[in-house]
Amino acid sequence: MAKAKFERTKPHVNVGTIGHVDHGKTTLTAALTKIGAERFGGEFKAYDAIDAAPEEKARGITISTAHVEYESPSRHYAHVDCPGHADYVKNMITGAAQMDGAILVCSAADGPMPQTREHILLSRQVGVPHIVVFLNKADMVDDAELLELVEMEVRELLSKYDFPGDDTPIIHGSARLALDGDQSEIGVPAILKLVDALDTFIPEPTRDVDRPFLMPVEDVFSISGRGTVVTGRIERGIIKVGDEIEIVGIRATQKTTVTGVEMFRKLLDQGQAGDNAGLLLRGTKRDDVERGQVLCKPGSIKPHTEFEAEVYVLSKDEGGRHTPFFKGYRPQLYFRTTDITGAIDLPEGVEMVMPGDNVKMTVTLINPVAMDEGLRFAIREGGRTVGAGVVSKIIK
């Protein structure tokens, strides 16, 4: 059979299921693909196919993630589902699967559980912008008051972590009944309601190419008679010949103008997000720019040295440390293209961090780095990755 061509006709949105173990995340994922395939196109993925999530590596960390796709009338959704709690923690912190929005699955029979809370907190920390709720297993709860109580608890939990709890769509249903084709209110119609909530409550994401220009510096060359060329992969935005840019990070910010854009030794008028490009900079010396800095649209990003982060520490089996670390730990933090030493401070009451833990920490870097909240980094010791983190709050 010929391979189906990827149709780019509908806008593309990345989502995923989060929530406590055994509350029905994978069953709901299967139901979304089944009903999506029947109504709007796409292909049904059965529970077992999703549950056997393949392992993949992100920033040196092995994560099991299932990727499925489904359609709504107006969008194409790429959806991630993880088998285990640890996979969620790793996935969200490394940004292996960026989510424009999440579907929080909570069992109506059990109500919010520890991982329900932890996944909401993680979503806040790593910058998942929107959450829609599916109260699953509604067929196991006969008491309408009990359902209302669980819904209230979930709304309070969302509000506690700065999500709009009162305005969040909460759909009652049974993923299992929907998979069986049940047409009652909590069966197939509940899944259609959920898809509608995704369409309306999760805004279309800004494409990388529409965001302000940013390119991490990978290499710097001096070309006699032409000047200095900086190479890297454009992370976001568009750069045109004649644009003014800033060089940010490590040292004082400098301004310059791009006088040439080249790709594969060809001169172009512009480069855009995703391109590996070389930019020729006016009046810039070879020694003015170094790996670890970024070129960006003036004023769009600032250098910082102190921030809060959410970090996952690799277990011994994953090639991480064999021993815990303590306050004052000074590893290398790898941002974009370079390592920078940072001092680690732990929250009050946390004495040490064990391999396999995830923890909130405060980091002070010895040199400033261009950063926004949501920037991912690796923690390294002597070139090997021992952890992964995400900037959750900039302090200074």
Curated annotation (Swiss-Prot):
Pfam families: GTP_EFTU, GTP_EFTU_D2, GTP_EFTU_D3. Keywords: Cytoplasm, Elongation factor, GTP-binding, Hydrolase, Magnesium, Metal-binding, Nucleotide-binding, Protein biosynthesis. Signal peptide: none annotated. It catalyses: GTP + H2O = GDP + phosphate + H(+). GO terms for molecular function: GTP binding; GTPase activity; guanosine tetraphosphate binding; translation elongation factor activity. It is found in: Cytoplasm. Residues 60-64 are annotated as: G2. Residues 10-206 form the tr-type G domain. GTP binds at residues 19-26, 81-85, 136-139. PROSITE patterns: G_TR_1, G_TR_2. Residues 81-84 are annotated as: G3. Its EC number is 3.6.5.3. GO terms for cellular component: cytosol. Residues 174-176 are annotated as: G5. Mg(2+) binds at residue 26. Residues 136-139 are annotated as: G4. Residues 19-26 are annotated as: G1. InterPro entries: EF-Tu_GTP-bd, EF-Tu_GTPase, EFTu-like_2, EFTU_2, G_TR_CS, P-loop_NTPase, Small_GTP-bd, T_Tr_GTP-bd_dom. GTP hydrolase that promotes the GTP-dependent binding of aminoacyl-tRNA to the A-site of ribosomes during protein biosynthesis. Monomer. Belongs to the TRAFAC class translation factor GTPase superfamily. Classic translation factor GTPase family. EF-Tu/EF-1A subfamily. NCBIfam families: EF-Tu, PRK00049.1, PRK12735.1, PRK12736.1, small_GTP. HAMAP family: EF_Tu_B. This is Elongation factor Tu. The gene is tuf1.
